[in-house]
Amino acid sequence: MVIKAQSPAGFAEEYIIESIWNNRFPPGTILPAERELSELIGVTRTTLREVLQRLARDGWLTIQHGKPTKVNNFWETSGLNILETLARLDHESVPQLIDNLLSVRTNISTIFIRTALRQHPDKAQEVLATAHEVADHADAFADLDYNIFRGLAFASGNPIYGLILNGMKGLYTRIGRHYFANSEARSLALGFYHKLSSLCEQGAHDQVYETVRRYGHDSGEIWHRMQKNLPGDLAIQGR
């Protein structure tokens, strides 16, 4: 186990998470007692207690008053906030993880973008107008793309869509910095934003679904061509 962490708490957190991932602490089992675990990891019990509380909030553990701490099946108990951690734990599965993430984005955005354009066209146009002055480089486009999807999610009037996008932010923007290094990807995105703006102006809400699906397909093809050069820094850095 190779752990890169910048603090005792970060080290303890990564140690426990990787131990769960590698079945040293299998889901459904009981975590070692606090004293034993703190000595095993090499941190104070106070530090360990703080880490356990954080991991419980993220769904890795269940802390029960007066009872041993239980290791959860994180697939069933955690949220989108662990996406970057999963990417770090299993780099070989990152392409599939990203495919799943982008598929979810396309599927839900067909709903909230159409709703935003239909019910709140002024807000939608305000969001889409931010694409007019974007700098032509990967970092700027990664931030723009995330903010446009997130902005349209909130413009739909249903904040739950926005919260879902919030949960995707870390891994989403890391993917974007790699993807938008491709000039074809940047050009495709600008065309997509312009198309949405035109549909909004025309009130052609019935065309949004196919437009979003087409963009998901075309951007996915570019992404798949780029996957063989996937960088190793998509995962979250140690604390």
Swiss-Prot record:
GO terms for biological process: fatty acid metabolic process; regulation of fatty acid metabolic process. It holds the Pfam family GntR. Residues 6-74 form the HTH gntR-type domain. The gene is fadR. InterPro entries: FA-response_TF_FadR, FadR_C, TF_FadR/GntR_C, Tscrpt_reg_HTH_GntR, WH-like_DNA-bd_sf, WH_DNA-bd_sf. This is Fatty acid metabolism regulator protein. PROSITE patterns: HTH_GNTR. SMART domains: HTH_GNTR. It is found in: Cytoplasm. Homodimer. Residues 34-53 bind DNA.
